[in-house]
């Protein structure tokens, strides 16, 4: 069996979980949707790309894209029909550039670190730890999970930060 090819994800998704309305105790289960599965749905339904075009963007074969889309839709449908929460994390993907900017202007630093469940395979989305650093003046601030460092402005000089 050959190794699984990591998929290109152009967009850092800020939502990490969706839950049915109601008390937490009433939600029996959750479904895990990976980052690359969410990207497959985004490219297909929000960017209206054909499966061939979307597969090229993710640098995978069209048949792989089709299987990932089917799997993602099955998971979301299961969650909606059975009232399950959807947790979004992990997957086998990489961001296209290692400076925190990706083609969509977002993304974690360290494109290769995003394999599996993030930094060290135990974290989420490239790891919740770490710092955002200003490339212009060197100022550092702790990374806030769920917020791309490229969206944070340096307190000293106003430049966009990058993930360290």
Curated annotation (Swiss-Prot):
<comment type="similarity">
    <text>Belongs to the UPF0251 family.</text>
</comment>
<dbReference type="Pfam" id="PF02001">
    <property type="entry name" value="DUF134"/>
</dbReference>
<protein>
    <recommendedName>
        <fullName>UPF0251 protein MA_0157</fullName>
    </recommendedName>
</protein>
<dbReference type="InterPro" id="IPR002852">
    <property type="entry name" value="UPF0251"/>
</dbReference>
<feature type="compositionally biased region" description="Gly residues">
    <location>
        <begin position="99"/>
        <end position="115"/>
    </location>
</feature>
<feature type="region of interest" description="Disordered">
    <location>
        <begin position="91"/>
        <end position="124"/>
    </location>
</feature>
<dbReference type="InterPro" id="IPR013324">
    <property type="entry name" value="RNA_pol_sigma_r3/r4-like"/>
</dbReference>
